[in-house]
Regions:
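Short acidic, glycine/serine/threonine-rich loops at helix termini
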Residues: 21-23, 29-32, 61-63, 97-102, ...
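Short capping/connector residues at structural and topological boundaries
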Residues: 30, 38, 45-48, 103, ...
Length: 163
């Protein structure tokens, strides 16, 4: 029984990084299993914000491993991500995507979005970044709302965390 469906959007603006995630967990292709899952959370003494999409078990496993690495690397986000990626094949200044296959991606424009509604959220966030003075948190939330209005695997129970 595969569980899927989520959208995570991260935005970096004016020295702040905000990550927003919806709360929907979908089982199979057509059943909403949960509406209020928490896929964005703070770790490392609330100094780092993470968001995850994909298989529930894989996502929790990846988050736990990442938090362990972050502690081992004394809070160095980049070292922890690279260390985890090398092992996995599986800070406030860095926003990184770590994929299940071990790639570590640092987006060029300070915006990234993943999951089933990721492309919608990414497009919305880029438009908002370019055409408004909204904060990182406001952009991330509004981008998620756009994705939720289009993608059936994304809902509008949105949690936003900012560092």
């Amino acid at each position: 029984m595969a569980m899927m469906g989520t959208t995570i959007c991260a935005v970096k603006r004016d020295g702040k990084i905000a990550i927003a995630g919806d709360g929907q967990v979908t089982m199979g292709e057509n059943t909403i299993f949960k509406n209020s899952a928490r896929k964005v959370r703070r770790i490392y003494n609330d100094k780092v914000v993470t968001g995850f999409a994909g298989s529930v078990a894989d996502a929790f496993s990846l988050c736990e491993r990442f938090e362990e690495r972050l502690n081992q690397c004394n809070g160095s986000l980049e070292r922890a991500a690279v260390s985890l990626a090398q092992d996995w094949r599986a800070d406030k200044e860095n926003m990184l995507i770590v994929s299940g296959t071990g790639e570590v991606i640092d987006p060029d424009d300070g915006i990234c979005a993943i999951g089933s509604g990721g492309n919608y959220a990414l497009a919305a966030a880029r438009a908002l970044m370019e055409n408004t003075d909204l904060s990182a948190a406001e952009i991330a939330e509004k981008a998620l709302r756009v994705a939720a209005s289009i993608c059936v695997f994304t809902n509008d129970h949105i949690i936003v965390e900012e560092v």
